[in-house]
Amino acid sequence: MAKELKGIAASDGIAIAKAYLLVEPDLSYEKTEVTDVESEVKRFESALEVSRTELSMIREKAAKDLGEDKAQIFDAHLLVLNDPELTGPIEESIKNSKTNAETALQETTDMFIGMFESMDNEYMRERAADIKDVRKRVLSHLLGVTIPNPALIDEEVVVVAADLTPSDTAQLNRNFVKGFVTDIGGRTSHSAIMARSLEIPAVVGTKEVTASVAKNDIVIIDGLEGNVIIHPTEEQIAHYEKIKSDFALQQAEWDKLKNEKTVSKDGVHVELAANIGTPNDLEGVISNGGEAVGLYRTEFLYMGRDNFPTEEEQFEAYKAVVSGMDGKSVVVRTLDIGGDKTLPYLELPEEMNPFLGFRAIRLCFANEELFRTQLRALLRASVYGNLKIMFPMIATVNEFRQARDILLDEKAKLKAAGTEVSDSIELGIMIEIPAAAVLADQFAKEVDFFSIGTNDLIQYTMAADRMNERVSYLYQPYNPSILRLVKMVIDASHKEGKWTGMCGEMAGDQTAVPLLLGLGLDEFSMSASSILKSRSLIKRLDQSEMVKLAEEALNKSTAEEVVELVEKYTAE
Protein backbone atom coordinates (compact mmCIF):
# COMPACT_ATOMS: atom_id res chain seq x y z
CA MET A 1 0.00 0.00 0.00
CA ALA A 2 1.34 3.41 -0.96
CA LYS A 3 2.44 5.76 1.81
CA GLU A 4 2.87 9.48 1.25
CA LEU A 5 5.12 11.78 3.27
CA LYS A 6 5.55 15.53 3.12
CA GLY A 7 8.89 17.26 3.49
CA ILE A 8 10.76 20.32 2.26
CA ALA A 9 11.52 20.57 -1.46
CA ALA A 10 15.29 21.06 -1.42
CA SER A 11 16.35 20.44 -5.03
CA ASP A 12 14.20 20.42 -8.19
CA GLY A 13 13.32 17.28 -10.13
CA ILE A 14 11.62 13.89 -9.91
CA ALA A 15 13.37 10.63 -8.98
CA ILE A 16 11.84 7.14 -9.09
CA ALA A 17 14.05 4.25 -7.99
CA LYS A 18 14.57 1.62 -5.33
CA ALA A 19 15.71 2.74 -1.90
CA TYR A 20 19.28 2.55 -0.66
CA LEU A 21 19.28 2.94 3.12
CA LEU A 22 22.27 4.77 4.50
CA VAL A 23 22.15 3.26 7.98
CA GLU A 24 24.37 4.38 10.83
CA PRO A 25 26.87 1.62 11.75
CA ASP A 26 26.93 0.03 15.20
CA LEU A 27 29.75 1.85 16.99
CA SER A 28 29.04 0.48 20.46
CA TYR A 29 31.99 -0.58 22.62
CA GLU A 30 32.86 -1.47 26.20
CA LYS A 31 34.91 0.70 28.51
CA THR A 32 38.04 -1.22 29.45
CA GLU A 33 41.23 -0.60 31.37
CA VAL A 34 44.50 -0.90 29.45
CA THR A 35 47.87 -1.95 30.78
CA ASP A 36 50.03 -1.01 27.79
CA VAL A 37 49.25 2.70 27.65
CA GLU A 38 51.81 3.55 24.94
CA SER A 39 50.41 0.92 22.58
CA GLU A 40 46.90 2.28 23.16
CA VAL A 41 48.06 5.82 22.34
CA LYS A 42 49.66 4.50 19.14
CA ARG A 43 46.41 2.70 18.26
CA PHE A 44 44.58 6.01 18.64
CA GLU A 45 47.18 7.86 16.55
CA SER A 46 46.92 5.20 13.86
CA ALA A 47 43.13 5.65 13.70
CA LEU A 48 43.68 9.41 13.41
CA GLU A 49 46.11 8.96 10.52
CA VAL A 50 43.80 6.62 8.60
CA SER A 51 40.96 9.09 9.13
CA ARG A 52 43.09 11.96 7.81
CA THR A 53 43.97 9.99 4.68
CA GLU A 54 40.34 9.02 4.14
CA LEU A 55 39.07 12.58 4.58
CA SER A 56 41.73 13.97 2.25
CA MET A 57 40.54 11.56 -0.45
CA ILE A 58 36.90 12.55 0.13
CA ARG A 59 37.86 16.22 -0.08
CA GLU A 60 39.68 15.65 -3.36
CA LYS A 61 36.63 13.90 -4.82
CA ALA A 62 34.33 16.67 -3.62
CA ALA A 63 36.52 19.33 -5.22
CA LYS A 64 36.47 17.43 -8.51
CA ASP A 65 32.73 16.66 -8.56
CA LEU A 66 31.23 19.64 -6.73
CA GLY A 67 33.79 22.42 -6.98
CA GLU A 68 36.40 23.73 -4.58
CA ASP A 69 33.98 25.90 -2.62
CA LYS A 70 31.82 22.88 -1.67
CA ALA A 71 34.92 20.87 -0.73
CA GLN A 72 35.98 23.46 1.84
CA ILE A 73 33.67 21.90 4.41
CA PHE A 74 36.12 19.02 4.81
CA ASP A 75 38.88 21.42 5.76
CA ALA A 76 37.00 21.97 9.03
CA HIS A 77 37.02 18.20 9.64
CA LEU A 78 40.74 17.96 8.87
CA LEU A 79 41.37 20.86 11.23
CA VAL A 80 39.60 18.91 13.99
CA LEU A 81 41.77 15.85 13.31
CA ASN A 82 44.90 18.01 13.43
CA ASP A 83 43.93 20.08 16.46
CA PRO A 84 46.26 19.29 19.39
CA GLU A 85 43.81 20.99 21.76
CA LEU A 86 41.43 18.11 21.02
CA THR A 87 43.74 15.17 20.31
CA GLY A 88 46.08 16.07 23.18
CA PRO A 89 43.45 15.69 25.94
CA ILE A 90 42.34 12.37 24.42
CA GLU A 91 45.88 10.99 24.62
CA GLU A 92 46.24 12.40 28.14
CA SER A 93 43.01 10.65 29.13
CA ILE A 94 44.37 7.32 27.86
CA LYS A 95 47.60 7.81 29.84
CA ASN A 96 46.13 9.18 33.05
CA SER A 97 42.96 7.09 33.28
CA LYS A 98 44.49 3.99 31.67
CA THR A 99 41.29 3.71 29.64
CA ASN A 100 40.85 2.37 26.13
CA ALA A 101 41.06 4.80 23.20
CA GLU A 102 37.35 4.48 22.36
CA THR A 103 36.33 5.66 25.83
CA ALA A 104 38.88 8.47 25.92
CA LEU A 105 37.71 9.65 22.49
CA GLN A 106 34.03 9.55 23.45
CA GLU A 107 34.35 11.22 26.85
CA THR A 108 36.72 13.97 25.71
CA THR A 109 34.74 14.85 22.60
CA ASP A 110 31.50 14.79 24.63
CA MET A 111 33.00 17.54 26.76
CA PHE A 112 33.91 19.68 23.75
CA ILE A 113 30.59 19.02 21.99
CA GLY A 114 28.63 20.00 25.10
CA MET A 115 30.65 23.18 25.43
CA PHE A 116 30.12 24.20 21.79
CA GLU A 117 26.42 23.27 21.72
CA SER A 118 25.72 25.44 24.75
CA MET A 119 27.04 28.55 23.02
CA ASP A 120 24.68 31.13 21.54
CA ASN A 121 26.90 31.57 18.50
CA GLU A 122 25.67 29.46 15.57
CA TYR A 123 29.15 29.15 14.05
CA MET A 124 30.45 27.55 17.25
CA ARG A 125 27.48 25.17 17.36
CA GLU A 126 28.39 24.05 13.84
CA ARG A 127 31.85 23.12 15.16
CA ALA A 128 30.10 20.63 17.46
CA ALA A 129 28.65 18.94 14.36
CA ASP A 130 32.14 18.77 12.83
CA ILE A 131 33.50 17.06 15.95
CA LYS A 132 30.65 14.50 15.91
CA ASP A 133 31.33 13.66 12.25
CA VAL A 134 35.06 13.27 12.86
CA ARG A 135 34.50 11.23 16.04
CA LYS A 136 32.33 8.75 14.14
CA ARG A 137 35.07 8.28 11.56
CA VAL A 138 37.88 7.79 14.09
CA LEU A 139 35.73 5.49 16.24
CA SER A 140 34.93 3.30 13.24
CA HIS A 141 38.64 2.78 12.58
CA LEU A 142 39.31 1.98 16.24
CA LEU A 143 36.53 -0.64 16.18
CA GLY A 144 37.28 -1.96 12.71
CA VAL A 145 33.74 -1.14 11.62
CA THR A 146 33.08 -0.04 8.06
CA ILE A 147 31.17 3.22 7.63
CA PRO A 148 28.73 2.98 4.69
CA ASN A 149 30.43 4.43 1.63
CA PRO A 150 27.97 6.05 -0.79
CA ALA A 151 30.75 6.23 -3.36
CA LEU A 152 30.43 2.44 -3.83
CA ILE A 153 26.80 2.63 -5.04
CA ASP A 154 26.78 1.13 -8.54
CA GLU A 155 23.09 0.91 -9.45
CA GLU A 156 20.29 3.44 -9.82
CA VAL A 157 18.86 4.25 -6.37
CA VAL A 158 17.43 6.98 -4.21
CA VAL A 159 19.32 7.38 -0.96
CA VAL A 160 17.26 7.35 2.25
CA ALA A 161 18.87 8.56 5.47
CA ALA A 162 18.12 10.23 8.77
CA ASP A 163 20.45 12.97 7.59
CA LEU A 164 23.37 13.21 5.23
CA THR A 165 26.66 14.57 6.51
CA PRO A 166 28.82 16.62 4.16
CA SER A 167 31.10 13.57 3.96
CA ASP A 168 28.17 11.42 2.78
CA THR A 169 26.89 13.87 0.20
CA ALA A 170 30.30 14.53 -1.32
CA GLN A 171 30.62 10.82 -2.15
CA LEU A 172 27.34 10.53 -4.06
CA ASN A 173 27.82 9.45 -7.66
CA ARG A 174 25.36 11.33 -9.86
CA ASN A 175 25.35 8.49 -12.39
CA PHE A 176 23.71 6.16 -9.88
CA VAL A 177 22.20 8.28 -7.10
CA LYS A 178 19.06 9.74 -8.65
CA GLY A 179 17.94 11.63 -5.56
CA PHE A 180 17.77 11.51 -1.79
CA VAL A 181 15.33 12.00 1.06
CA THR A 182 16.05 12.60 4.75
CA ASP A 183 14.27 12.73 8.10
CA ILE A 184 15.74 16.08 9.10
CA GLY A 185 17.17 19.21 7.50
CA GLY A 186 15.98 22.38 5.82
CA ARG A 187 16.41 24.14 2.49
CA THR A 188 19.62 25.82 3.68
CA SER A 189 21.14 22.70 5.31
CA HIS A 190 24.41 21.31 3.95
CA SER A 191 22.70 18.33 2.34
CA ALA A 192 20.19 20.54 0.49
CA ILE A 193 22.91 22.86 -0.80
CA MET A 194 24.95 19.86 -1.98
CA ALA A 195 21.90 18.38 -3.75
CA ARG A 196 21.46 21.56 -5.75
CA SER A 197 25.16 21.51 -6.65
CA LEU A 198 24.83 17.90 -7.83
CA GLU A 199 21.57 18.84 -9.60
CA ILE A 200 19.71 15.81 -8.22
CA PRO A 201 16.18 15.87 -6.73
CA ALA A 202 15.99 16.00 -2.95
CA VAL A 203 13.39 16.26 -0.20
CA VAL A 204 14.50 16.88 3.38
CA GLY A 205 12.80 17.16 6.77
CA THR A 206 10.22 14.37 6.30
CA LYS A 207 10.69 13.33 9.97
CA GLU A 208 9.87 9.63 9.41
CA VAL A 209 11.16 8.39 6.07
CA THR A 210 13.78 6.05 7.57
CA ALA A 211 11.11 4.43 9.74
CA SER A 212 8.87 3.96 6.71
CA VAL A 213 11.23 2.58 4.07
CA ALA A 214 12.93 -0.81 3.73
CA LYS A 215 15.85 -1.66 1.47
CA ASN A 216 14.85 -1.91 -2.22
CA ASP A 217 11.38 -0.38 -1.69
CA ILE A 218 10.37 1.71 -4.69
CA VAL A 219 10.32 5.39 -3.73
CA ILE A 220 9.24 8.52 -5.61
CA ILE A 221 10.97 11.78 -4.67
CA ASP A 222 9.23 14.95 -5.80
CA GLY A 223 11.83 17.69 -5.35
CA LEU A 224 9.48 20.22 -6.93
CA GLU A 225 6.75 20.03 -4.30
CA GLY A 226 8.39 18.19 -1.38
CA ASN A 227 6.39 14.96 -1.72
CA VAL A 228 7.70 11.43 -1.08
CA ILE A 229 5.74 8.29 -2.00
CA ILE A 230 6.74 4.82 -0.74
CA HIS A 231 5.36 1.72 -2.51
CA PRO A 232 3.67 3.88 -5.18
CA THR A 233 0.84 2.45 -7.25
CA GLU A 234 1.24 2.00 -11.00
CA GLU A 235 -0.98 5.05 -11.49
CA GLN A 236 1.25 7.16 -9.23
CA ILE A 237 4.38 5.99 -11.01
CA ALA A 238 2.82 6.86 -14.37
CA HIS A 239 1.74 10.27 -13.04
CA TYR A 240 5.23 11.13 -11.80
CA GLU A 241 6.91 9.74 -14.90
CA LYS A 242 4.80 12.29 -16.81
CA ILE A 243 5.87 15.09 -14.45
CA LYS A 244 9.49 13.96 -14.82
CA SER A 245 9.17 13.95 -18.60
CA ASP A 246 7.52 17.38 -18.60
CA PHE A 247 10.26 18.75 -16.34
CA ALA A 248 12.94 17.37 -18.68
CA LEU A 249 11.18 19.07 -21.60
CA GLN A 250 11.05 22.27 -19.57
CA GLN A 251 14.79 22.04 -18.93
CA ALA A 252 15.36 21.44 -22.65
CA GLU A 253 13.38 24.60 -23.39
CA TRP A 254 15.48 26.52 -20.87
CA ASP A 255 18.63 25.19 -22.56
CA LYS A 256 17.55 26.95 -25.76
CA LEU A 257 17.98 30.25 -23.92
CA LYS A 258 21.70 29.70 -23.23
CA ASN A 259 22.89 32.14 -25.87
CA GLU A 260 20.15 34.71 -25.45
CA LYS A 261 20.16 37.98 -23.55
CA THR A 262 17.82 38.36 -20.60
CA VAL A 263 15.11 40.73 -21.81
CA SER A 264 11.68 41.21 -20.26
CA LYS A 265 8.48 40.94 -22.29
CA ASP A 266 8.45 44.72 -22.77
CA GLY A 267 12.11 44.94 -23.82
CA VAL A 268 13.96 45.78 -20.59
CA HIS A 269 17.39 44.12 -20.42
CA VAL A 270 18.85 42.87 -17.15
CA GLU A 271 21.99 40.83 -16.61
CA LEU A 272 21.97 37.30 -15.20
CA ALA A 273 25.31 36.49 -13.62
CA ALA A 274 26.74 33.64 -11.56
CA ASN A 275 28.37 33.35 -8.15
CA ILE A 276 31.64 31.38 -8.23
CA GLY A 277 34.34 30.29 -5.79
CA THR A 278 37.14 29.07 -8.07
CA PRO A 279 38.25 29.22 -11.72
CA ASN A 280 36.90 25.66 -12.09
CA ASP A 281 33.37 27.02 -11.66
CA LEU A 282 33.59 28.93 -14.95
CA GLU A 283 32.52 25.86 -16.92
CA GLY A 284 29.14 25.92 -15.19
CA VAL A 285 28.73 29.66 -15.78
CA ILE A 286 29.35 29.33 -19.51
CA SER A 287 27.31 26.13 -20.00
CA ASN A 288 24.33 27.76 -18.25
CA GLY A 289 24.46 30.93 -20.32
CA GLY A 290 25.80 33.26 -17.64
CA GLU A 291 26.19 36.83 -18.88
CA ALA A 292 28.76 37.70 -16.22
CA VAL A 293 30.34 36.67 -12.94
CA GLY A 294 28.50 38.73 -10.34
CA LEU A 295 30.47 37.44 -7.37
CA TYR A 296 33.88 35.77 -7.30
CA ARG A 297 34.46 34.72 -3.68
CA THR A 298 38.25 35.02 -3.39
CA GLU A 299 38.46 33.55 0.13
CA PHE A 300 38.44 30.02 -1.30
CA LEU A 301 41.95 30.71 -2.65
CA TYR A 302 43.06 31.06 0.96
CA MET A 303 41.38 27.92 2.31
CA GLY A 304 42.50 24.30 2.26
CA ARG A 305 46.16 25.20 2.73
CA ASP A 306 48.58 26.07 5.51
CA ASN A 307 49.85 29.46 4.30
CA PHE A 308 48.73 32.56 2.45
CA PRO A 309 48.58 32.31 -1.34
CA THR A 310 51.37 34.27 -2.98
CA GLU A 311 50.71 37.26 -5.21
CA GLU A 312 51.64 35.12 -8.22
CA GLU A 313 49.22 32.32 -7.25
CA GLN A 314 46.43 34.84 -6.86
CA PHE A 315 47.29 36.59 -10.13
CA GLU A 316 47.07 33.31 -12.05
CA ALA A 317 43.67 32.49 -10.52
CA TYR A 318 42.22 35.94 -11.19
CA LYS A 319 43.68 35.99 -14.70
CA ALA A 320 42.08 32.59 -15.45
CA VAL A 321 38.62 33.84 -14.46
CA VAL A 322 38.86 37.27 -16.10
CA SER A 323 40.25 35.94 -19.39
CA GLY A 324 37.93 32.91 -19.28
CA MET A 325 34.87 35.18 -19.36
CA ASP A 326 36.05 36.62 -22.67
CA GLY A 327 35.32 40.28 -22.03
CA LYS A 328 32.20 39.74 -19.92
CA SER A 329 32.05 41.43 -16.53
CA VAL A 330 33.75 39.73 -13.56
CA VAL A 331 33.03 41.22 -10.13
CA VAL A 332 35.67 40.13 -7.64
CA ARG A 333 35.03 40.46 -3.91
CA THR A 334 38.15 41.08 -1.88
CA LEU A 335 38.97 38.74 1.00
CA ASP A 336 35.98 38.03 3.25
CA ILE A 337 37.42 36.03 6.15
CA GLY A 338 36.00 35.92 9.67
CA GLY A 339 32.51 35.15 10.92
CA ASP A 340 31.87 31.63 9.61
CA LYS A 341 35.09 31.48 7.57
CA THR A 342 38.43 30.97 9.29
CA LEU A 343 41.97 30.17 8.18
CA PRO A 344 44.14 27.70 10.14
CA TYR A 345 47.24 29.85 9.64
CA LEU A 346 45.64 33.20 10.57
CA GLU A 347 45.04 33.66 14.27
CA LEU A 348 41.76 35.46 14.87
CA PRO A 349 40.57 36.73 18.24
CA GLU A 350 37.84 34.78 19.99
CA GLU A 351 34.70 36.90 19.85
CA MET A 352 31.25 36.61 21.37
CA ASN A 353 29.73 37.36 17.95
CA PRO A 354 32.22 37.02 15.09
CA PHE A 355 29.57 37.94 12.50
CA LEU A 356 29.53 41.44 14.00
CA GLY A 357 33.23 41.51 14.71
CA PHE A 358 36.68 41.40 13.17
CA ARG A 359 36.01 40.21 9.63
CA ALA A 360 36.18 41.09 5.92
CA ILE A 361 37.38 44.66 5.22
CA ARG A 362 38.01 45.24 8.94
CA LEU A 363 40.43 42.34 9.02
CA CYS A 364 42.08 43.53 5.80
CA PHE A 365 42.74 46.99 7.22
CA ALA A 366 44.40 45.40 10.26
CA ASN A 367 46.48 43.13 7.98
CA GLU A 368 47.26 45.71 5.32
CA GLU A 369 50.08 43.87 3.57
CA LEU A 370 47.78 40.88 3.11
CA PHE A 371 45.23 43.25 1.53
CA ARG A 372 47.82 44.98 -0.65
CA THR A 373 49.08 41.65 -1.98
CA GLN A 374 45.59 40.72 -3.13
CA LEU A 375 45.00 44.13 -4.70
CA ARG A 376 48.28 43.95 -6.63
CA ALA A 377 47.32 40.54 -8.03
CA LEU A 378 43.90 41.87 -9.05
CA LEU A 379 45.32 45.00 -10.67
CA ARG A 380 47.78 42.92 -12.70
CA ALA A 381 44.95 40.62 -13.84
CA SER A 382 42.76 43.57 -14.86
CA VAL A 383 44.31 43.84 -18.34
CA TYR A 384 43.02 40.37 -19.30
CA GLY A 385 39.33 41.24 -19.33
CA ASN A 386 36.52 43.22 -17.75
CA LEU A 387 37.44 43.21 -14.05
CA LYS A 388 35.43 44.98 -11.36
CA ILE A 389 36.43 45.01 -7.67
CA MET A 390 34.14 45.27 -4.65
CA PHE A 391 34.85 45.52 -0.95
CA PRO A 392 32.80 43.49 1.59
CA MET A 393 31.26 44.54 4.92
CA ILE A 394 31.55 48.27 4.29
CA ALA A 395 29.71 50.22 6.99
CA THR A 396 30.95 53.79 6.48
CA VAL A 397 31.97 56.02 3.58
CA ASN A 398 35.40 56.43 5.19
CA GLU A 399 35.95 52.66 5.01
CA PHE A 400 35.33 52.73 1.26
CA ARG A 401 37.67 55.70 0.86
CA GLN A 402 40.39 53.94 2.84
CA ALA A 403 40.10 50.77 0.72
CA ARG A 404 40.02 52.79 -2.50
CA ASP A 405 43.09 54.81 -1.49
CA ILE A 406 45.10 51.67 -0.74
CA LEU A 407 44.13 50.27 -4.15
CA LEU A 408 45.07 53.52 -5.93
CA ASP A 409 48.40 53.57 -4.10
CA GLU A 410 49.20 50.03 -5.30
CA LYS A 411 48.05 50.93 -8.82
CA ALA A 412 50.43 53.91 -8.90
CA LYS A 413 53.33 51.76 -7.69
CA LEU A 414 52.68 49.10 -10.34
CA LYS A 415 52.49 51.70 -13.11
CA ALA A 416 55.69 53.35 -11.89
CA ALA A 417 57.38 49.94 -12.13
CA GLY A 418 56.19 49.56 -15.73
CA THR A 419 53.42 47.03 -15.02
CA GLU A 420 50.35 47.36 -17.23
CA VAL A 421 47.12 48.00 -15.33
CA SER A 422 43.63 48.73 -16.68
CA ASP A 423 42.36 52.28 -16.22
CA SER A 424 38.71 51.24 -16.43
CA ILE A 425 38.31 49.10 -13.28
CA GLU A 426 34.98 49.81 -11.60
CA LEU A 427 35.04 49.90 -7.78
CA GLY A 428 31.99 48.96 -5.74
CA ILE A 429 30.86 47.81 -2.32
CA MET A 430 28.75 45.02 -0.92
CA ILE A 431 25.56 46.34 0.65
CA GLU A 432 25.10 43.89 3.51
CA ILE A 433 25.10 46.21 6.53
CA PRO A 434 21.87 48.21 7.03
CA ALA A 435 23.92 51.36 7.71
CA ALA A 436 25.31 51.21 4.17
CA ALA A 437 21.85 50.71 2.69
CA VAL A 438 20.45 53.70 4.58
CA LEU A 439 23.40 55.85 3.45
CA ALA A 440 23.35 54.54 -0.13
CA ASP A 441 22.69 58.03 -1.54
CA GLN A 442 26.06 59.21 -0.18
CA PHE A 443 27.94 56.06 -1.18
CA ALA A 444 26.51 56.31 -4.70
CA LYS A 445 28.39 59.58 -5.25
CA GLU A 446 31.71 57.78 -4.79
CA VAL A 447 31.35 54.13 -5.85
CA ASP A 448 30.79 52.79 -9.37
CA PHE A 449 28.26 50.14 -8.35
CA PHE A 450 26.53 48.34 -5.50
CA SER A 451 26.10 44.59 -4.98
CA ILE A 452 23.44 43.71 -2.42
CA GLY A 453 24.40 40.71 -0.28
CA THR A 454 20.95 39.72 0.93
CA ASN A 455 22.07 36.76 3.06
CA ASP A 456 23.77 39.07 5.57
CA LEU A 457 21.58 42.12 4.95
CA ILE A 458 18.49 40.14 6.00
CA GLN A 459 20.24 38.69 9.06
CA TYR A 460 21.50 42.07 10.23
CA THR A 461 18.24 43.89 9.51
CA MET A 462 16.03 41.29 11.22
CA ALA A 463 18.61 40.53 13.96
CA ALA A 464 18.12 36.83 13.22
CA ASP A 465 20.70 34.14 12.45
CA ARG A 466 19.22 32.20 9.53
CA MET A 467 21.00 29.00 10.66
CA ASN A 468 19.52 29.23 14.16
CA GLU A 469 16.30 27.20 14.08
CA ARG A 470 14.93 29.07 17.10
CA VAL A 471 14.85 32.39 15.23
CA SER A 472 15.00 31.30 11.58
CA TYR A 473 11.32 32.24 11.18
CA LEU A 474 12.54 35.86 11.24
CA TYR A 475 14.83 35.34 8.26
CA GLN A 476 12.34 36.87 5.82
CA PRO A 477 13.58 37.89 2.35
CA TYR A 478 10.10 39.17 1.48
CA ASN A 479 9.62 41.31 4.56
CA PRO A 480 8.62 44.79 3.33
CA SER A 481 11.47 46.28 5.39
CA ILE A 482 13.99 44.32 3.31
CA LEU A 483 12.28 45.27 0.05
CA ARG A 484 12.35 48.93 1.08
CA LEU A 485 16.09 48.76 1.77
CA VAL A 486 16.66 47.12 -1.62
CA LYS A 487 14.63 49.86 -3.34
CA MET A 488 16.53 52.56 -1.44
CA VAL A 489 19.86 51.19 -2.69
CA ILE A 490 18.73 50.73 -6.31
CA ASP A 491 17.16 54.20 -6.48
CA ALA A 492 20.26 55.83 -4.98
CA SER A 493 22.53 54.20 -7.56
CA HIS A 494 20.29 55.09 -10.50
CA LYS A 495 20.06 58.72 -9.38
CA GLU A 496 23.85 58.94 -9.77
CA GLY A 497 23.90 56.99 -13.04
CA LYS A 498 25.34 53.87 -11.36
CA TRP A 499 24.10 50.26 -11.32
CA THR A 500 23.08 47.77 -8.64
CA GLY A 501 23.41 44.00 -8.59
CA MET A 502 22.39 41.37 -6.06
CA CYS A 503 24.46 38.31 -5.18
CA GLY A 504 22.54 36.75 -2.29
CA GLU A 505 20.27 33.70 -2.54
CA MET A 506 17.31 36.03 -3.06
CA ALA A 507 18.57 36.95 -6.57
CA GLY A 508 17.72 33.49 -7.91
CA ASP A 509 14.53 32.95 -5.93
CA GLN A 510 11.62 32.58 -8.34
CA THR A 511 9.25 34.41 -5.99
CA ALA A 512 11.68 37.31 -5.55
CA VAL A 513 12.64 37.74 -9.22
CA PRO A 514 9.39 39.52 -10.28
CA LEU A 515 9.71 41.90 -7.31
CA LEU A 516 13.39 42.63 -7.99
CA LEU A 517 12.65 43.26 -11.66
CA GLY A 518 9.99 45.75 -10.59
CA LEU A 519 12.35 47.43 -8.12
CA GLY A 520 14.79 48.08 -10.97
CA LEU A 521 17.61 45.64 -10.15
CA ASP A 522 20.23 45.69 -12.93
CA GLU A 523 22.11 42.44 -12.28
CA PHE A 524 20.88 39.18 -10.73
CA SER A 525 23.80 36.99 -9.59
CA MET A 526 22.94 33.44 -8.52
CA SER A 527 24.08 29.82 -8.64
CA ALA A 528 24.79 28.93 -12.27
CA SER A 529 22.13 26.20 -12.26
CA SER A 530 19.40 28.82 -11.62
CA ILE A 531 20.26 31.12 -14.53
CA LEU A 532 18.22 29.57 -17.35
CA LYS A 533 15.16 29.08 -15.16
CA SER A 534 15.33 32.75 -14.13
CA ARG A 535 15.89 33.91 -17.71
CA SER A 536 12.80 32.02 -18.82
CA LEU A 537 10.76 33.67 -16.07
CA ILE A 538 11.96 37.21 -16.81
CA LYS A 539 11.27 36.85 -20.54
CA ARG A 540 7.62 36.15 -19.64
CA LEU A 541 7.31 39.19 -17.37
CA ASP A 542 6.33 42.73 -18.30
CA GLN A 543 8.71 45.00 -16.37
CA SER A 544 6.24 47.89 -16.27
CA GLU A 545 3.70 45.58 -14.60
CA MET A 546 6.36 44.39 -12.15
CA VAL A 547 6.94 48.02 -11.12
CA LYS A 548 3.30 48.17 -10.03
CA LEU A 549 3.62 44.78 -8.28
CA ALA A 550 6.71 45.96 -6.39
CA GLU A 551 5.04 49.22 -5.36
CA GLU A 552 2.12 47.27 -3.95
CA ALA A 553 4.50 44.88 -2.13
CA LEU A 554 6.35 47.80 -0.52
CA ASN A 555 3.11 48.88 1.13
CA LYS A 556 2.27 45.48 2.62
CA SER A 557 2.71 44.85 6.34
CA THR A 558 4.13 41.32 6.40
CA ALA A 559 6.27 38.92 4.39
CA GLU A 560 3.30 36.56 4.12
CA GLU A 561 1.22 39.27 2.45
CA VAL A 562 4.00 39.92 -0.06
CA VAL A 563 4.32 36.23 -0.98
CA GLU A 564 0.55 35.95 -1.34
CA LEU A 565 0.58 38.99 -3.64
CA VAL A 566 3.28 37.53 -5.92
CA GLU A 567 1.65 34.09 -6.01
CA LYS A 568 -1.68 35.66 -6.92
CA TYR A 569 -0.05 37.54 -9.79
CA THR A 570 1.94 34.58 -11.15
CA ALA A 571 -1.14 32.33 -10.99
CA GLU A 572 -3.09 34.67 -13.27
Curated annotation (Swiss-Prot):
Its cofactor is Mg(2+). GO terms for molecular function: kinase activity; metal ion binding; phosphoenolpyruvate-protein phosphotransferase activity. One of its GO terms (biological process) is phosphoenolpyruvate-dependent sugar phosphotransferase system. Mg(2+) binds at residues 432, 456. It holds the Pfam family PEP-utilisers_N. Phosphoenolpyruvate binds at residues 297, 333, 455-456, 466. GO terms for cellular component: cytoplasm. InterPro entries: PEP-util_enz_mobile_dom, PEP-utilizing_PTS_enzyme, PEP_util_AS, PEP_util_C, PEP_util_CS, Phosphohistidine_dom_sf, PTS_EI, PTS_EI-like. Keywords: Cytoplasm, Kinase, Magnesium, Metal-binding, Phosphotransferase system, Sugar transport, Transferase, Transport. Gene3D superfamilies: Phosphoenolpyruvate-binding domains, Phosphohistidine domain, PtsI, HPr-binding domain. Its EC number is 2.7.3.9. It is found in: Cytoplasm. It catalyses: L-histidyl-[protein] + phosphoenolpyruvate = N(pros)-phospho-L-histidyl-[protein] + pyruvate. The active site is at residues 190, 503. General (non sugar-specific) component of the phosphoenolpyruvate-dependent sugar phosphotransferase system (sugar PTS). This major carbohydrate active-transport system catalyzes the phosphorylation of incoming sugar substrates concomitantly with their translocation across the cell membrane. Enzyme I transfers the phosphoryl group from phosphoenolpyruvate (PEP) to the phosphoryl carrier protein (HPr). The N-terminal domain contains the HPr binding site, the central domain the pyrophosphate/phosphate carrier histidine, and the C-terminal domain the pyruvate binding site. Homodimer. Belongs to the PEP-utilizing enzyme family. The reaction takes place in three steps, mediated by a phosphocarrier histidine residue located on the surface of the central domain. The two first partial reactions are catalyzed at an active site located on the N-terminal domain, and the third partial reaction is catalyzed at an active site located on the C-terminal domain. For catalytic turnover, the central domain swivels from the concave surface of the N-terminal domain to that of the C-terminal domain. This is Phosphoenolpyruvate-protein phosphotransferase.
